[in-house]
């Protein structure tokens, strides 16, 4: 089935590669500078200023100049599909895409989203998400991003951006920087140490810039005491100078706080141009910016730079070549006059399916083998009776959970609920279904007692802080299942000898109560699977596909083990530093329940033949700055490979993972860090070779004194395995000091 998908994918997504390398930016800049000469001052200001909230068909719109052939730019959410429009595809969330660990699917998802955005006339799609990274396991918007690990998140950013922009839409990497919680997000100062900032939070943005991302969105919060959208250190020095970003920085909606400071500190576009209620005096740019340039408060060169960056991004992805007009309005129900979905449901189903993580499978409970009867228990098994889009921006948790809430959502064209999909399969198998689609423990136990096997559906939701759901102001109040999920599982487990638990969640939940039930034989994490939820689940639990997802974060035994959570204060000093998620667990010697990178299969894999070839010298990266950072930072300096054999009786995909431990000469470094992965699809008895190419950056740490990436001298440890703790092969290599 996975082999078949690749051929279907070619038909599902047609892209045209415009390229995102430095030479293409050079060409785009040349054209942008020519266009700049034709614009008057008011037109220039119009290109960098939103027309105000609800001032056009999209959530963000700019003014259309008359002097050049350039549109009113349409900017639209979200990172998992098109918000406020229909019909569109509601793709699995970023956290699911990350859980696939599949670079082909990451690209395909990005390309399909980009194709839909272009078809609707959207110029800038507001995604993907690298921040929040997810240092707080209950952070409200973690699910919009790909992983708590910067390396995995960075690869996902790169592949997604390339897919989106190859389809013709401008991508927007967000939220820059330190937006790790929803509580106090409009006022909090994220005080991040220089080294932790570079090695964790900036890292995936480096990959985004290297991939040629057109735009970056600065966040609501302060960073080290200064608003992110008017931070010279963050935007000019770090993003534009150190990372060599040629594109433009836009504000998050109403994240701008000044006229002059934001302009001279590197902001290039303000959105949406006014406060949401459009009060007088809420427009910082527009005529105010024009006046500031006229009196010299903002240099003319700064305004021209803003405009050039915005125009260059437009040329970079080829939007000057027959781009379609906007085909919907966000404010009248979003009905589009064109259907852009094609067969992107194929991509959505593949991502949802291959992101499913099998956490437990005692006694070979899964896959199901035509059981005589099945109890389906829990409200999470069915679609919200009021409809999948009944709550604005998905701001409720009624029925099965397939995406979180907030601006990072999309309208479901349909939602296949788990019960519906299982009933369809059960009818073909002759299996009797005994449903209990509430969260009442007594009713659930009654249904379970009447069936051979019971499947209990539980969930945990979160989202953006402008919506509060069941007392959760964006961030989750705790890491427990919602709707009394633990009690529901306990009741069902007391009534049935064979219980399977399916989890739809935005992030980790504490599973100790569930694991304490002897009759809970299998646990499946399905995340936020989007419109194809039920179909993808059936593909896996019935064995049509072997599960191949791996956790993009750690599941702890207790919430306190994470050492981080959102704080009820307006200052977060990021005391954990580099030690986030598995880095923290490893350094502190804390045993997780399920570690980062973990995921079971219906088959087994044997690793052998580790090979290491390295040609690196110690020292700092000093190359010319290119998009992403110093050019020599991205040079390949070595290679690691390992053989993986499928020892089982069914085909399966294994994610081989490479972790590196830096030498003792590197100060205060986590024991190991992810630095490579490859997903191998293997038939029974087949052996494949996973190969990991290592760059100087992969071997480096950020030296706060030198203000450079430095490869330390000494012995590096090499760990290759099936997860961050299931290490199958170990080795080492030595790096000597350069001359």
Swiss-Prot record:
Keywords: Carbohydrate metabolism, Cellulose degradation, Glycoprotein, Glycosidase, Hydrolase, Polysaccharide degradation, Secreted, Signal. It is found in: Secreted. The active site is at 252. It catalyses: Hydrolysis of terminal, non-reducing beta-D-glucosyl residues with release of beta-D-glucose. Pathway: Glycan metabolism; cellulose degradation. Residues 1-17 form the signal peptide. It comes from the Eukaryota. Beta-glucosidases are one of a number of cellulolytic enzymes involved in the degradation of cellulosic biomass. Catalyzes the last step releasing glucose from the inhibitory cellobiose. Belongs to the glycosyl hydrolase 3 family. This is Probable beta-glucosidase L. The lineage of its organism: Eukaryota, Fungi, Dikarya, Ascomycota, Pezizomycotina.
């Amino acid at each position: 089935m996975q082999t078949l998908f690749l051929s279907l994918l070619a038909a599902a997504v047609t892209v045209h590669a415009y390229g995102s390398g430095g030479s293409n930016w050079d060409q785009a800049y040349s054209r942008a500078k020519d266009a700049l000469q034709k614009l008057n001052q008011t037109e220039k200001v119009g290109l960098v200023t939103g027309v105000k909230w609800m001032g056009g068909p999209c959530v963000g719109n700019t003014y259309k100049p008359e002097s050049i052939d350039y549109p009113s730019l349409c900017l639209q959410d979200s990172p998992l599909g098109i918000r406020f429009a229909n019909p569109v595809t509601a793709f699995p969330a970023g956290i699911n895409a990350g859980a696939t660990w599949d670079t082909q699917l990451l690209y395909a998802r990005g390309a399909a989203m980009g194709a839909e955005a272009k078809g609707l006339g959207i110029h800038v799609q507001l995604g993907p998400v690298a921040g929040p990274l997810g240092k707080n396991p209950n952070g409200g918007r973690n699910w919009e991003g790909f992983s708590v690990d910067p390396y995995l998140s960075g690869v996902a950013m790169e592949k997604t951006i390339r897919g989106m922009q190859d389809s013709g839409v401008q991508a927007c990497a967000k939220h820059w920087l330190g937006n790790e919680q929803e509580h106090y997000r409009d006022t909090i100062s994220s005080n991040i140490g220089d080294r932790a900032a570079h090695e964790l939070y900036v890292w995936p943005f480096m990959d985004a810039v290297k991939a040629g991302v057109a735009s970056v969105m600065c966040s609501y919060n302060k960073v080290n005491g200064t608003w992110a959208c008017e931070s010279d250190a963050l935007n000019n020095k770090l993003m534009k100078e150190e990372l060599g970003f040629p594109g433009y920085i836009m504000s998050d909606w109403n994240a701008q706080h000044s006229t002059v400071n934001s302009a001279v500190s590197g902001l290039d576009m303000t959105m949406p141009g006014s406060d949401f209620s459009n009060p007088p005096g809420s427009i910082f740019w527009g005529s105010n910016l024009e006046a500031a340039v006229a009196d010299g408060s903002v240099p003319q060169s700064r305004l021209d730079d803003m405009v050039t960056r915005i125009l260059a991004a437009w040329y970079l992805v080829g939007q000057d070549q027959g781009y379609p007009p906007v085909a919907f309005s966000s404010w009248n129900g979003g009905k589009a006059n064109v259907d852009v979905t094609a067969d992107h449901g194929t991509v959505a189903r593949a991502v949802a399916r291959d992101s499913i993580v099998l956490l437990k499978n005692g006694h070979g409970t899964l896959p199901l083998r035509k059981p005589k009867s099945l109890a389906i228990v829990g409200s999470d098994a069915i679609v919200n009776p009021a409809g999948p889009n009944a709550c604005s921006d998905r701001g409720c948790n009624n029925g099965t959970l397939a995406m979180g809430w907030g601006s990072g959502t999309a309208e479901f064209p349909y939602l296949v609920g788990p019960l519906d999909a299982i009933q369809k399969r059960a009818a073909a198998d002759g299996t009797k279904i005994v449903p209990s689609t509430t969260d009442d423990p007594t009713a659930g136990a009654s249904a379970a007692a009447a069936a051979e096997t019971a499947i209990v559906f539980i969930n945990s939701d979160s989202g953006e802080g402008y919506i509060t759901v069941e007392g959760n102001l964006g961030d989750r109040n705790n890491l427990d299942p919602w709707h009394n999920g633990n009690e529901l599982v306990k009741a069902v487990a007391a009534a049935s000898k064979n219980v399977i638990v399916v989890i739809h969640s935005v992030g980790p939940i504490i599973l100790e109560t569930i694991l304490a039930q002897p009759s809970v034989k299998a646990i499946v994490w399905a995340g936020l699977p989007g419109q194809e939820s039920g179909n993808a689940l059936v593909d896996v639990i019935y064995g049509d596909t072997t599960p191949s997802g791996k956790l993009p974060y750690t599941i702890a035994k207790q919430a306190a083990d994470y050492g981080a959570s959102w704080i009820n204060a307006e200052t977060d000093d990021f005391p954990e530093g580099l030690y986030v998620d598995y880095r923290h667990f490893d350094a502190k010697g804390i045993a997780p329940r399920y570690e980062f990178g973990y995921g079971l299969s219906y088959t087994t894999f044997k690793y052998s033949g580790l090979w290491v070839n390295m040609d690196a010298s110690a020292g700092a990266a000093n190359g010319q700055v290119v998009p992403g950072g110093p050019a020599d930072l991205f040079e390949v300096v070595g290679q690691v490979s390992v053989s993986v054999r499928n020892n089982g009786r069914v085909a399966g995909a294994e994610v081989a993972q490479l972790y590196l431990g830096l030498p003792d000469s590197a100060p205060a470094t986590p024991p190991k860090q992810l630095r490579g992965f490859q997903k191998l699809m293997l038939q029974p008895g087949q052996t494949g070779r996973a190969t990991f190419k290592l760059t100087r950056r992969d071997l480096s740490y950020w030296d706060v004194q030198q203000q450079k990436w430095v490869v330390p001298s000494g012995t590096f440890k090499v760990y290759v395995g099936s997860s961050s703790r299931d290490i199958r092969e170990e080795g080492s290599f030595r790096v000597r000091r350069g001359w």
